[in-house]
């Protein structure tokens, strides 16, 4: 868990959710700096959550944000398992349907923004519905 200084000067522990929210906000700012346009964050559908939904031109991008302190055990990008990919695909499918779309009618892709230590890696088209 990360720590943050408080007014009293003694650091306090961030919750896992607060840490995740902070890295997602960092990823959003970083991607906006690369020209992507923000659509939504922390989108919940039955059985899953998508960290960020952004747009690049006509492409809707579903983004999973991961953070790991070190590359031990494969680092942040390696933590997006097949099971997690399946949940993201299902969540995106439901979100698209709620917005009158589908994988057949909307140009979309699945990216991963992985923070490992001080390094950031943007994996475009990390997986798809044909994987």
From Swiss-Prot:
**What CDD domains does the record point to?**
PoNe_Nuclease
> What family does the Swiss-Prot or TrEMBL record give for this protein?
Belongs to the UPF0102 family.
Please list the disulfide bridges. Answer: none
| Classification via InterPro entries | Restrct_endonuc-II-like, tRNA_endonuc-like_dom_sf, UPF0102_YraN-like
Q: List GO molecular-function terms, semicolon-separated.
A: nucleic acid binding
The family database entries (HAMAP family) matched by this protein are listed as:
UPF0102
Q: Where is the composition biased (Polar residues)?
A: 1-19
What is this protein's record name?
UPF0102 protein YraN
**Per the record, which residues fall in region Disordered?**
1-21
Gene for this protein? yraN
Question: What Pfam families does the record tag this protein with?
Answer: UPF0102
């Amino acid at each position: 868990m990360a720590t943050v200084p408080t007014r009293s000067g003694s650091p306090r522990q961030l919750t896992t959710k607060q840490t995740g929210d902070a890295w997602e906000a960092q990823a959003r700012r970083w991607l906006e700096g690369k020209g992507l346009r923000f659509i939504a964050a922390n989108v919940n559908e039955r059985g899953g959550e998508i960290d960020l939904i952004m747009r690049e031109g006509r492409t809707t991008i579903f983004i999973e944000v991961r953070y790991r302190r070190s590359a031990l055990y494969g680092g942040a990008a390696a933590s997006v398992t097949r099971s997690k990919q399946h949940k993201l695909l299902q969540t995106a499918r439901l979100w698209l349907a709620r917005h009158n779309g589908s994988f057949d009618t909307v140009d979309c892709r699945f990216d991963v923004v992985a923070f490992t230590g001080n390094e950031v890696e943007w994996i475009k088209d990390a997986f798809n519905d044909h994987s």
